[in-house]
Structures are given as structure tokens and as C-alpha cells.
Regions:
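Extracytoplasmic/secreted envelope proteins and their assembly/folding machinery
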Residues: 64-71, 94-98, 111, 128, ...
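Conserved strand-to-helix beginnings and helix N-cap segments that scaffold or border functional pockets
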Residues: 61-64, 91-95, 189-192
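Extracytoplasmic thiol/disulfide redox context detector
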Residues: 2-89, 162, 204-214
């Protein structure tokens, strides 16, 4: 056997061993939670991944620089969606803000800038004067925003987000859920990168059981 082939076989063997160790290391109840009952998903033919977050959560803010490149590398069979977790009226207000910006078509564009404004500039979304001034600086029509935030569509999405928070038994943020079957927190992942590695593992588990998602 020539040296090149031998090295290739050794590398493949180590890769297989590493993958087996990784799968073995991810233990249900320790590194992630198995949901019982499973929650309904809204991603026909795809694997649904949800991120539960709150704009005021420093851990969610710290996840963003790691999450952004991860999202760019998502496989086409994965559908990712952000869900503002809701535990109290303050969180519900930020959920309304999130869904209003989304409805106006600027949600993705302003997601990171809003995080920055909150955690770097101490902006509060419940300070109407300060927040409206921030919206104006971003080129958002404040009058239109004030109409949208009171709309039936936004109120419905807030109720749905609250139901998802309860249904997925989310007790802190950030947390991620995979296809209605699993949830994982930063504590379970050990770090932001660890969280995403476990999500990758759970996506792989789900993919094996969903032929249509391959």
C-alpha cells in the first residue's frame, strides 16, 4: 500500500472515530432535551430550526457573531426562524417590536443594529421617545411603525410566539429547537459555539428520519 493511500485511510478512520465520539458525547437530558410530546412544525419538506431570543439578553447578543456565519452555511434543507421568547410584558413588548419590523420588511436589516443599540448604547425599546428617534435614524417611518405594532397581524404573531415559548418549555435564552423534537441551551452546549455544534448534531439526527428533507 502506498503512503498516500495509507494516510488517506488513516485520516478517514480518525474522522469516523471523531464523528462517533461526537455523537456519543451528545447525551439527551444532558446536552439537549428531547421534547415529549413533539411540537408541530411549519416547514414542509425541510428541517425546522428555531432560535428563541430576547433583545435584552446579553447571551443572545453574544451569540449573534457566531450565529451569523453559521446561518450563511446552512444546508438548503434547513428552515431557520427566529422566535422572540415571551415570559412577561417587557419581553412581549420587544416581541411586538421584532414582528413589527419584520412586517415592515426591515426586520433582518435592523436585527443586529437593534441588538447593538440596546447593548452598546443602552437603548430601551419601551422608551418611546428614544426608540422612535432611533427608528428615524434607521430610515424607518415612525408613524407607520406605530400603526403596524398595533395591528392584528403583529398581535397574532406575539400570541403564537408566547405559545411556542410555552410549548417548547423554554426557560431561558438563547435556546434553539430542532424540528419540534429537541431543544438545547447555551448552558447545555457549554458555549455559543458548543450550542451550534449540538444543533448540527440534532439536525443530522433529524435528517436521517426525514427522507423528504434530504
Amino acid at each position: 500500500m502506498d503512503k498516500t493511500r495509507r494516510r488517506t485511510l488513516v485520516a478517514l478512520a480518525f474522522a469516523a472515530l471523531g464523528g462517533a465520539r461526537l455523537a456519543h458525547a451528545q447525551q439527551p437530558g444532558v446536552n439537549y432535551t428531547v421534547l415529549k410530546p413533539e411540537q408541530p412544525v411549519n416547514a414542509p419538506g425541510k428541517i425546522e430550526v428555531l432560535e428563541f431570543f430576547w433583545y435584552g439578553c446579553i447571551h443572545c447578543y453574544n451569540l449573534e457573531p457566531v450565529l451569523e456565519p453559521w446561518l450563511k452555511g446552512l444546508a438548503p434543507d434547513i428552515q431557520f426562524r427566529r422566535v422572540p421568547a415571551i415570559f412577561n410584558p417587557r419581553w412581549a413588548h420587544d416581541a411586538k417590536t421584532f414582528f413589527s419590523l419584520e412586517a415592515m420588511g426591515v426586520g433582518e436589516k435592523l436585527h443586529r443594529p437593534l441588538f447593538d443599540a440596546i447593548h452598546q448604547d443602552r437603548l430601551r425599546t419601551d422608551d418611546a421617545q428614544a426608540f422612535n428617534a432611533w427608528l428615524q435614524r434607521q430610515g424607518v417611518d415612525v408613524k407607520r411603525f406605530e400603526e403596524v405594532i398595533k395591528s392584528f397581524g403583529v398581535q397574532s404573531k406575539v400570541r403564537q410566539a408566547q405559545q411556542l415559548t410555552v410549548g417548547y418549555r423554554i426557560d431561558g435564552t438563547p435556546a434553539m429547537a430542532v424540528h419540534g423534537r429537541y431543544t438545547v441551551s447555551v448552558d447545555q452546549g457549554g458555549s455559543q459555539r458548543g450550542l451550534l455544534k449540538i444543533v448540527d448534531h440534532l439536525v443530522a439526527l433529524t435528517r436521517k428520519s426525514l427522507p423528504a428533507a434530504r
